[in-house]
Every structure is written in C-alpha cells, then in structure tokens.
Swiss-Prot record:
Enzymatic reactions: L-seryl-[protein] + ATP = 3-O-(5'-adenylyl)-L-seryl-[protein] + diphosphate; L-threonyl-[protein] + ATP = 3-O-(5'-adenylyl)-L-threonyl-[protein] + diphosphate; L-tyrosyl-[protein] + ATP = O-(5'-adenylyl)-L-tyrosyl-[protein] + diphosphate; L-histidyl-[protein] + UTP = N(tele)-(5'-uridylyl)-L-histidyl-[protein] + diphosphate
Cofactor(s) this protein requires: Mg(2+); Mn(2+)
Job of this protein: Nucleotidyltransferase involved in the post-translational modification of proteins. It can catalyze the addition of adenosine monophosphate (AMP) or uridine monophosphate (UMP) to a protein, resulting in modifications known as AMPylation and UMPylation.
A Pfam family recorded for this sequence: SelO
Residues the record lists as binding Mg(2+): 245, 254
Name of the featured protein: Protein nucleotidyltransferase YdiU
Transmembrane segments: none
Similarity annotation: Belongs to the SELO family.
Native species: Shewanella oneidensis (strain ATCC 700550 / JCM 31522 / CIP 106686 / LMG 19005 / NCIMB 14063 / MR-1)
Active site: 244
Length: 484
C-alpha cells in the first residue's frame, strides 16, 4: 500500500497518535477482492497479515485515532472519538484514496475504559454488511478483511478478538464538527479549518468561502437523504443512527446491531438497546433530518443560519425523490423525467398502500418484491395474489397498479428489469449468525460462501437457493445488542 497523510499532517488537533497493539495468532477469516482492488492490493499475504493485525509496522502508515463528539440516542456526549479504531492513513488506489482503519486494533485515548477490541462476531457482521450493501447499490464504507485471533476478550461471556480492516472515503463524521463547536472548544477557526480540509479533499469543485460552504452543506443534506432513501427501499435498519455514526459523505457507516427486514414491519427495532424505538426502521428518515439539524447547529459559527435552514428544507424533497425513483423501479414503473407533483403523490400512495398490505399480511419484504420478476403484469390474476389473506384489498390495489403501469409489450424484458433491482439474496441476521457459529467452530466455508453469494444479490444462483429462503422460526426478526 502507498499512503498519503493529509488528515494527519494538516489537522493535528483532530486526533491522537496511537499505535495498534497486536493480536495473538492472527489469521485471515475473510478477504474482499473487490475492496482490495480499491487500494491496489491483490491477494492477502503473510506480510500484510502481520501489518494489519498490529503485530508489525506498515510502511508509510501514521497510526492515529480521531476525536469527535456526538448525539447518542438524543443526548449530547461531549467527547467520544475512536475508542477502538486506529487509522493508518489514506491509501492511494487507482481511482482515489481510501482511509484504512483497524477496527479492534487496541485501546486509544478515547476508549473510555474499554479494551479497544472487537469480537469476532461483530467483525464478521461488519465485513458482511459493508460488502453486501455495496453490491446492493447502497452508498457505504467498505471492508477489506477480517483478521481473527486466539486472544480472549470479555463481553457477556468470553469471546475472541478480531479486527475488521475498514476502508472509507473519509472518516469525517457529523460529530467532528460538533466537537469543535460546543462547550469551551467552540472556536470558529477550528470549524473553518476542518471545513476547508473537507472541501479540498472531497469537494474540490467548491470554493472555501461562504458560497462554497453553503453549497457543501446542501450537498451533505442531499447525500444523507439519498443514503436513507436506499435504506428504506432495500429494507435496511441501521440500528444506531447517532450523529457520530453519520458520515459527512452520505456513506453507510459504523455498523452494529443492524438488520435487513424479514417480515415487513414499519416499527421494526433491530437494536436490543433501543426499547423505545428511536432508531426503528420507519423512524430513520426523520432521524436523518434530526441529525442534519444537529450538524447545522454546530456549523452556525461558520455558515449563515438562513443558508443552513434553506438546505435543511430541501431534505424531505430529496429523500422523497430518491425513494420514489428506487421504489418505482422495484414496481417496474416507468419514471417520466418530468413527473408532476400530483403523479409523485399518487405513486407514494400506491407504494404506501402496498407496504401496508405487506405488513397486514405479514409478508417477507424481499421475497415479495422479488416476486415481481415472475409477474405477468397484463394478467388480471396476479401471481402475487395467493400470498395475501385479504384478497379484496389486494385486488383493489392491483387494479390501481395495473392502471398506473400501463401496457407492457415485452413481459420478459420487464421481468428481467424487476429482477435487476429486487434482490434474491440479502444478509439476513440468521445467515450471519450461522456463519459466525461456523467460524467459531473453525469452519470458514460458510462465511466464504455467504460472502460470495452476496456479491451477486440480484442473480439467480441455483446452487445457493437455500440462502434465499425465509428465516427459520428462531431467526425471524432477530434483535442484536450493541455489545461488540
């Protein structure tokens, strides 16, 4: 790997230098060829294993943990920071630079009495979801590898330590701006310094002046709306949408107790530590705006309030337009470039009625959408109909849907188009759990197989048909904890 060290050299007050503490008996548990190509790597090597496990120095790496704050479950925490993630620097790839971070690399000044370690189960989950989301077309950070060990760590019980090697276009979070805005640290010069760095690194077309800042914040609003629209369309619940888990670039970030929907449930809670459902699936769009409002509040020393408010007022429109585009594609609808506000509202109602029907009939979210690839839209009797209990309600919906769809001249091409946007394979929690159990028993085959299948989520893979099945009773709607 070849590194540049722009964050390290230009923002010395935004991190602490800290070196990883190695893990015993490191070994590869997972590796992503796709992610490796982003930074010019090919095959995993012993030298790379020693470096990324913290047991040897990586040439050109600087090693640091970033400091930030954030709103966690609605309450402000003035000092957070990377408690178990150590960044090596920005690795230069063929199409840009990516931060390389060792998640679970050992304690840092921000560990808050924690051990700085990650356990194998959380490392495997983060690896799988990072790569799964990418191949589903969702903006996300990436995962290069998981490195296992025989080092014991204690959570609810004894587990083994592991490291996820994360790649990110940037690790700058909403919480970075909050840290230097609130309390005694509130200094406009630090905010301006961070903002200018962000623009030069990631928005070089924008100028470092009030006009550029205004345009930048609007872009953050739009990118965040796009990310959350993808989550809602694909049926993904993040679980911990704290402001310190929000990427400034609109990439899905910092995965913990996430879940993809099994049975559709608007108020589904995937996080055992969220009994009130603040971050429930259906709450994510509203929380996205709330988090952006907190970012705007932190930016008031450097961006005019009127400009911040004007950008925030664009959030709902951006979210709806991205969501409509994704859901129209799932329904096989043709989207006119100049669709009217009236048509948008009618389509939102059509989509909303269908998801309500799914919830009332307790249907599997991904399976139901995938069925559109088998549908003959010209038929008066939908093959979907048999999945529903309330047939009158479904028939009424289907009649409106057919009218909106219009005549389909090439049914096979239409079905193929539906299959290109409605995945056959998703990372259900029970599949991840089965892979984790197998890894714990020393068997990597199940993890490797699941990873490979999730690289082609829209493609029929007959030999892996069982990975597309609905979850067994024990795996339905699994709720995970934040323990990692």
């Amino acid at each position: 790997m070849k590194f540049k060290q722009d964050f390290f050299t230009q923002l010395p007050e935004f991190y602490s230098q800290v070196y990883p503490q190695g893990i015993s008996n490191p070994h590869w548990l997972a590796w992503s060829d796709d992610a490796a190509a982003l930074i010019g790597l090919h095959q995993p090597t012993d030298e790379l294993l020693q470096g990324l496990s913290g047991n040897a120095a990586v040439e050109g790496a600087s090693y640091y943990a970033q400091v930030y704050s954030g709103h966690q479950f609605g309450g402000y925490t003035p000092r957070l920071g990377d408690g178990r993630s150590i960044i090596l620097g920005e690795a230069i790839g063929p199409n840009g630079a990516w931060d390389v971070a060792l998640k679970g690399g050992g304690p840092t000044p921000y560990s808050r009495h924690g051990d700085g370690r990650a356990v194998m189960r959380s490392a495997v989950r983060e690896f799988l979801v990072s790569e799964a989301l990418h191949h589903l077309g969702v903006p996300t950070t990436r995962a290069l590898a998981v490195i296992g060990s025989d080092m014991p760590v204690w959570r609810e019980s004894q587990e083994t330590a592991a490291i996820t090697v994360r790649l990110a276009r940037s690790h700058i979070r909403f919480g970075h701006f909050e840290f230097f805005s609130h309390s005694e640290r509130g200094q406009a010069d630090k905010l301006t310094q961070l903002l200018n760095f962000t623009l030069k690194q990631h928005y070089p077309h924008l100028s470092c002046d009030p006009a550029g800042y205004k345009a930048w914040f609007l872009q953050v609003v739009q990118d965040s709306a796009k990310m959350i629209a993808h989550w809602q369309a694909i049926g993904f619940a993040h679980g911990v949408m704290n402001t310190d888990n929000m990427s400034i670039l609109g990439d899905s970030f910092d995965f913990g107790p996430f879940a993809f929907l099994d049975t559709f449930q608007e108020d589904f809670i995937c996080n055992h530590s969220d009994p009130d459902g603040r971050y429930a699936f259906g709450q994510q769009p509203g929380i996205g705006l709330w988090n952006l409002q907190r970012l705007a509040q932190a930016l008031t020393p450097v961006i005019a309030s009127d400009d911040l408010i004007a950008a925030l007022n664009q959030y709902q429109h951006a979210l709806v337009q991205h969501y409509l585009a994704l859901m129209r594609a799932k329904l096989g609808l043709v989207q006119q470039a100049d669709s009217s506000a009236e048509q948008d509202q009618q389509d939102l109602e059509l989509i909303g009625r269908f998801t309500v029907l799914m919830e009332k009939n307790q249907l599997d979210y991904s399976h139901t959408w995938r069925r559109f690839g088998q549908l003959d839209p010209s038929s008066l009797h939908s093959s979907l109909r048999d999945d529903f209990i309330d047939l009158n309600e479904f028939d009424a919906w289907y009649q409106v849907y057919q009218a909106r769809l219009g005549k389909v001249t090439d049914v096979e091409a239409w079905q193929q188009q539906c299959n290109r946007v409605n995945p056959k394979y998703i990372l259900r929690n029970y599949l991840a759990q089965e892979a984790i159990i197998a890894v714990d028993e020393g068997n990597l085959a199940q993890l490797q197989r699941l990873h490979q299948v999730l690289r082609q989520p829209f493609t029929e893979q007959i030999e892996h048909e069982e990975l597309a099945k609905r979850p067994p009773d024990w795996g339905q709607g699994l709720i995970m904890s934040c323990s990692s």
